[in-house]
Amino acid sequence: MDALVAGAGVGAVKFCPSCGSPRVERVVPSGDTLVRDVCAACGAIHYQNPKVVVGCLPEWEDRVLLCRRAIEPRRGLWTLPAGFLENNETLATGALRETLEEAGANVTLGDLYAVISLPQISQVYMLFRARLLDQRFGPGPESLEVRLFAESEVPWESLAFRTIARTLRNYFLDRRLAAYRLHVSSIGRRTPITPDLLAAG
């Protein structure tokens, strides 16, 4: 699941996961500087941390593989295969799993290519370059369609998320320069989606 919006609202804990008490308060614990969910019954502090989204930018010759979303948010729009990292997974394992689940594609992972922070919704995208092993791919349950696109064919106006547009713009620019590098940036509510070489991110 590519989840730019899913899980965006980080809400208060209603019941303490440690003791089950409903007496959970939003306070700054002693020795801390941020408001946390703290159980008034047992004293347990419940930390809420950013979610990690992992995925791939699958390549085949001069084309990239995109999936058209079958689920909300942004149903019917195009994205790279990506979703939430699961517990006990490495970044690489999660990226391979998401690519197989969403695109039915087997890939060989290359280098980590994009790290994009989305602080307003407490998410971090981590996307790898990847090489398709063959041209066998197809939509999984979360995709309507899976296709290879040349740069001139990318449906820029129909991309689901700014993270994906940023990553693809950087990728095609790097390809023209014949110099791929790790892109580390952030996207806020008003951040443009131009390549991070050209715009502050």
What are these regions (language model features)?
Residues 41, 69, 82, 130, ...:
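Active-site donor-binding loop signature of nucleotide-sugar glycosyltransferases
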Residues 15, 36, 57, 66, ...:
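Conserved hydrophobic/aromatic beta-strand scaffold that supports enzyme active sites
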Residues 31, 72, 116-120, 187:
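A short beta-turn/loop motif at secondary-structure boundaries
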Residues 3-6, 59-101:
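Conserved Nudix-box catalytic region and its N-terminal flanking loop in Nudix hydrolases
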Residues 34, 49-53, 59-61, 73-75, ...:
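Short connector loops at helix/strand junctions that flank enzyme active sites
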Residues 1-16, 170-175, 185-196, 200-201:
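A broadly conserved sequence feature marking short terminus-proximal activation segments
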Residues 85-170, 174-180, 192-201:
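Unchanged
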Residues 8-55:
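Acidic, metal-coordinating catalytic segment for phosphate/diphosphate chemistry
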